């Protein structure tokens, strides 16, 4: 589900209209705020639903291949009961800790991804300005220390100016908003994350709103 509001609306309707069994397991894969986790914990306590927060990473490709990584927060017993279901579409399922820790792990993931994508965008801008052969740059760097999943899978599509796929900048903007909200409570100044967040925010008024997060490069070169 898209954001806190969508998640909240869905589960309020679910509780009112669904004939669920007592102790039904709720596996929530959306990336949501910690405030929303608190609201869901209260919402599920009355009907005695078992709840784990289990955001994912791996993108469209991972979902299709069944190779998503899942970060789980919640009771260990609930995690163990849910793991068999999660293993159908995931090849890496990790219990992080108490409820909400799944979201914190996903926030950490998004901080890393936005920083890597910003570096890739600057590297592309630099190599292009120097009129380097982009295919040769990719082949030279893909197996070196500068490589990553994002570089291997997104640099070639950036070179081709192809962005109409993948995890949208709209969703990344939402995720980074939640990251920065929580960081503020901890008195953390995430300078690079905030800078990238502002660039993604500007893309929301463009066609790139629904395009892959790698279209961040457009905020540097267009």
Predicted regions and their residues:
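Short clusters of hydrophobic/aromatic residues that line enzyme substrate/ligand-binding pockets
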Residues: 7, 93-96, 151, 158
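Short glycine-enriched loops at secondary-structure junctions
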Residues: 3-4, 57-58, 143-147
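Proline-centered loop/turn at the N-terminus of a beta-strand
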Residues: 25, 50, 69, 189-191
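Short, solvent-exposed beta-strand edge segments and adjacent coil->beta transition regions
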Residues: 24, 65-69, 155
